[in-house]
From Swiss-Prot:
Oligomeric and partner information: Homodimer.
Broad class of the protein's primary localization: cytoplasm
EC number(s) per entry: 2.6.1.52
Xref: Pfam families: Aminotran_5
Taxonomy, superkingdom: Bacteria
Coiled coil stretches, renumbered: none
GO BP term (any one): L-serine biosynthetic process
Protein name: Phosphoserine aminotransferase
Organism lineage: Bacteria, Pseudomonadati, Pseudomonadota, Gammaproteobacteria, Pseudomonadales
């Protein structure tokens, strides 16, 4: 096999090589049973054991309290934009939302289809380069919940703090930074994350929801979108995304073997400090995000002359530095440096950036 490339894709994203090797080894014959996980009944004892271990490993990694359910659902994070108000926003009620970029705006637009949304805060006045402090937010007195995205994958804007709301449930989209650093799950009413960034392959969304928020779905909520029904059926009301669930479980095992979320946080800090440090010291590359709001996972940057973008990407591709093109709505470059992207990948990227600057700067 040729050398594996360094994959900076925002999602579907890099997976740990050890996980891919194990999945490859088990692909045709899972633990001597003579069949693939893809061929197993989700009701079989073997698969139920896989699913239960994945959940327990995630609980261990995140220290999830016992009064929270962990759901492995379908539809991706985008389906949660509707599922959350259908389950948590009563008819005639209001939900607070914070706008920090494209993904939080999508969640706001979807929630407005189901009820009243109060825009509690927006990064728009800062051109989405900074996040206002909570003292400047316009919170509702009786919000059913407050929703925000902890990390904006496209814009590279990340909260480095957790809102304090008293009794109002805090709902957070952690699709691109879950498991990247330690958090206190008990501060949140509901956490959700699409799998294809820091958890596993696409086709799966993980929802961590506090027990007291179950059973509140509207009568119009489809059965498949009701959290309580999902919880009561062990995330298997219908056939789940079995292979994605299995692979995510392998990632959780790998994370535990690496030392857990605390070790990931140390590694991720080193990666982001190296990359941002190089960008800030350069007169050729720029990142406009306020320092206290810079994403650890998704680092957008621009070249001094956008006419050089194609040459930069071609050179990166030739060196096995893949998927650095920025999102079409933002332009420029973006390096996504999730848990599975090692420090060696960031070192290789910085070396190339220095070489390109020397040649074209």
């Amino acid at each position: 096999m040729s050398k594996r490339a360094f994959n900076f894709c925002a999602g579907p994203a890099a997976l740990p090589e050890a996980v891919l090797q194990r999945a490859q080894a088990e692909l045709l014959d899972w633990q001597g049973r003579g069949l693939s996980v893809m061929e197993m009944s989700h009701r079989s004892d073997a698969y139920v054991a896989i699913a239960e271990k994945a959940e327990q490993d995630l609980r261990d990694l995140m220290a999830i309290p016992s009064d929270y359910k962990v759901l492995f659902l379908q539809g991706g994070a985008s389906q949660q934009f509707a599922e959350i108000p259908l389950n948590l926003l009563p008819e005639g009620g209001v939900a607070d939302y914070v706008d920090t970029g494209i993904w939080s705006r999508k969640s706001i637009e979807e929630a407005r289809r189901f009820g009243n949304v109060n825009l509690a805060a927006s990064a728009k006045p800062y051109d989405y380069f900074a996040i206002s402090g909570q003292n400047d937010w316009q919170l509702s007195d009786n919000a059913a919940y407050l929703h925000y995205a902890s990390n904006e994958t496209i814009g590279g804007l990340q909260f480095d703090w957790v809102p304090e709301l008293g009794d109002t449930p805090l709902v957070v989209d952690m699709s691109s930074d879950i498991l990247s650093r330690a958090i206190d799950v008990s501060k949140f009413g509901l956490i959700y994350a699409g799998a294809q960034k820091n958890i596993g392959p696409s086709g799966l969304v993980v929802v961590i929801v506090r027990d007291d928020l179950l059973g509140k779905a509207r009568s119009s909520c489809p059965t498949m979108l009701d959290y309580k029904i999902a919880a009561d059926n062990g995330s298997m009301y219908n056939t789940p995304a079995t292979f994605s669930w299995y692979l995510s479980g392998l990632v959780f095992e790998w994370l535990k073997e690496q030392g857990g979320v605390e070790v990931m946080e140390q590694r991720n800090r080193a990666k982001k400090e190296l990359l941002y440090g190089f960008i800030d010291a350069s007169e050729f590359y720029t990142n406009p995000i306020a320092e206290n709001a810079r994403s650890w996972m998704n680092v957008p940057f621009r070249l001094a002359d956008e006419r050089l973008d194609k040459a930069f990407l071609a050179g990166a591709d030739a060196r096995g530095l893949l998927n650095l093109k920025g999102h079409r709505s933002v332009g420029g470059m973006r390096a996504s440096i999730y848990n599975a992207v090692g420090l060696d990948a960031v070192e290789a990227l910085v070396a190339y950036m220095a070489e390109f600057e020397k040649e074209h700067g």
